[in-house]
Amino acid sequence: MSCVDCRFAPACVTVRTRNLCENCFIRFLQTKVLRRMERYRLRNAPKDRQRKLILPLSYGVSSLALLHIVSSLLLKQRTTGQKRTAFDLHVLIVDPVSLHPSKGAAASGRLAKIKEAYPDNTYSEVPLRSIFDYDPDIRGDISQHTGIPLGSNPSRSDEEILNLFRASFSTATARADIDGILLRRLIVAFAKSHKCDGILWGDSDSRLAAKTLANVAKGRGSSLVWNVCEGMSPWDIYFNFPLRDLYKSELEVYASYALRDLQQIIDQDPRNFEDLSNRHMSIEDLMSQYVLTQGAKYPGVMANIVRTVDKLTTPGVENAKMCILCRVPAGENLNAASGSQMDIGSNGETTTVPRSTCYGCMRTLLDMKAPTSNSG
């Protein structure tokens, strides 16, 4: 069977009912991505300065595919006689070991291979604890609004503070939620400190659909537009999702063709969810499993989830009250009264939750338990 595009090479993959050869499939996928990056075309570049974009790299198949496509675009601009590239690319890696210590062996040497494959980009690898350096407000937020007495033990390191905070949540959903907040705050703060024009998030349509369902389930529906939609974020930096028109399965096929030399460093997922007990499965895990299994049967339905969010009106951010934890304008969902409130968390303990939190963060903070380490 011949490819329906070039009508010459034999077809090797079926994409959305179309039989394509390897080259035509790669061109199809890359075109989808580049159309989502029209904002950053060379002809739209400012004359007086060079734009800079941040690409957070998780070593997953989606962010690696995005890195390959964007790096290839910039290389083509450099080698075709053009005097400049459309932008400079700064790749940010939050050290996987600082998030999941069990990944230590798998993470070894991966950045060196990435630099060898794409040497023209700028690279930074930072641990999660560097959030204290880039986001000076985070220390006060942890101390003042979660009850962890940081000031009583000044000898405690940033890593100890962060580990204590993350370990204080009693459920897998709360831990995953707070890790997501910390990661976003770190990436945004890092990008702003380096005067970047935007962030290229490597989220596929499948990932965005799972995030949408998970955020609604967690009570974060009011902030959906800033989690899955392109545009200016409340933090004065542009969010771009170049992979939003592509399914995770399509990116996996693309990686098998275009990233043959990097297959060994790609984080393989999904995890075997059947081996996880309910206690260790977060809402994010559950929604990812649902989208991956049902998306194979009904891809159009999964795509409509993200398209529906695109139709939502972006809430105004001027003079909006900001949640002290996730820093999202919460509007009417924010209880701005002074003081704090008492409630019963999922662990059965009475928990003090600051009133200046949005509904989603309030639910997460209710799952906090008392710190188990010595407070000094």
Curated annotation (Swiss-Prot):
Domain of life: Eukaryota
Record keyword tRNA processing present: yes
Molecular-function annotations in GO: nucleotidyltransferase activity; sulfurtransferase activity; tRNA binding
Major place of residence: cytoplasm
Cellular localization per UniProt: Cytoplasm
GO term, biological process aspect, one: protein urmylation
GO cellular component, one term: cytosol
Pfam families per the UniProt record, alphabetical: CTU2
Function in brief: Plays a central role in 2-thiolation of mcm(5)S(2)U at tRNA wobble positions of tRNA(Lys), tRNA(Glu) and tRNA(Gln). May act by forming a heterodimer with NCS6 that ligates sulfur from thiocarboxylated URM1 onto the uridine of tRNAs at wobble position. Prior mcm(5) tRNA modification by the elongator complex is required for 2-thiolation. May also be involved in protein urmylation.
Family: Belongs to the CTU2/NCS2 family.
Protein name: Cytoplasmic tRNA 2-thiolation protein 2
Gene assigned in the entry: NCS2
